[in-house]
Amino acid sequence: MGQYWKPVNLTKREFINPHKLKTGLKMVEQAFSADIAAAMVILLSVMPQRRGGGDMQNNPFIGRWAGDMVVFVGDYSIDADMPNSPLPFGTAYALTHGEDYTDATGVMHKAFTDVTDDVIEIMQANGMWNEDADKQAAF
């Protein structure tokens, strides 16, 4: 067994789904396989390209997470893991399942939005995504 992890933007309430990237959810599967989840976090977190760069086709989604509170959240996470979280941190992983979640105190939290397909579109436009591959390589 092991803990399952997903990249999450706590500010915008968005996440990346590693399964859509043909990789597992465990830390070792993401950290030592294809680096694809890390590539997506980089694409979302860089400062917007509108000031130049030119190494990728411009897309307004690039840099969408710049300056936001972005973390990898695990299914064993508890509130004490991140006391300055804008929401009870222990609920963050549950909010990546596409459904609203009611915590133990009866408070309902709105589900996070999956932005994986939006970032895959950027990667396809820049030759970084092979739909037929068993695993993806970031570069």
Where are the regions that the model predicts?
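Conserved, aromatic- and glycine-enriched, well-ordered alpha/beta core segments
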Residues: 20-33
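Short, extreme N-terminal segment that most often corresponds to the first beta-strand
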Residues: 1-22
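Low-complexity intrinsically disordered segments
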Residues: 30-139
